[in-house]
Each structure stands twice: as C-alpha cells, then as structure tokens.
C-alpha cells in the first residue's frame, strides 16, 4: 500500500508542477504580448516564479520517497 501511495504522490506532484510552470509561462507570454516594453521585468519574474513553483513538487517527491523507506 505504501508503494501505491508513493506512486500517486509522485505522479500528482509531477502533474501539478507541469501545470504550474505552464500557467506561469502562459502569463509571461500574455504580458509580453500586451506590453512588450516590460519583457525584461516579466522574464525576471518568470525566472523567479518557475523555481518556486517547482519547489513544492520536488518536496512532494522527496516525501513520497521517504514513505517508501
């Protein structure tokens, strides 16, 4: 049962991370399209936001590995 729980946690974490990154990149592209002069600022915020969005799934995967061992 622990294997199933770890697999579900890791899978959901991966999907959630991918969706979060897609939303951040989509918002950056839309913002750049609306105001091209803010491209540098939006890109900087994206480069900060993507690792923050990826941190939670990485922590969830580590916790799912801890469930196994």
UniProtKB/Swiss-Prot annotation:
- Any Pfam family the entry gives: ATP-synt_C
Q: Where in the cell is it found?
A: Cell membrane
List the coiled-coil residues: none
Provide the Gene Ontology terms for cellular component.
plasma membrane; proton-transporting ATP synthase complex; proton-transporting two-sector ATPase complex, proton-transporting domain
Tell me the GO molecular function terms: lipid binding; proton-transporting ATP synthase activity, rotational mechanism
InterPro entries the UniProt entry points to = ATP_synth_csu_bac/chlpt, ATP_synth_F0_csu, ATP_synth_F0_csu_DDCD_BS, ATP_synth_F0_csu_sf, ATPase_proteolipid_c-like_dom, F/V-ATP_Csub_sf
- Which segments cross the bilayer? 5-25, 47-67
How does this chain sit within the bilayer? Answer: Multi-pass membrane protein
* Site, Reversibly protonated during proton transport: residue positions: 54
Q: What does this protein do?
A: F(1)F(0) ATP synthase produces ATP from ADP in the presence of a proton or sodium gradient. F-type ATPases consist of two structural domains, F(1) containing the extramembraneous catalytic core and F(0) containing the membrane proton channel, linked together by a central stalk and a peripheral stalk. During catalysis, ATP synthesis in the catalytic domain of F(1) is coupled via a rotary mechanism of the central stalk subunits to proton translocation.
What is the protein name stated in its UniProt record?
ATP synthase subunit c
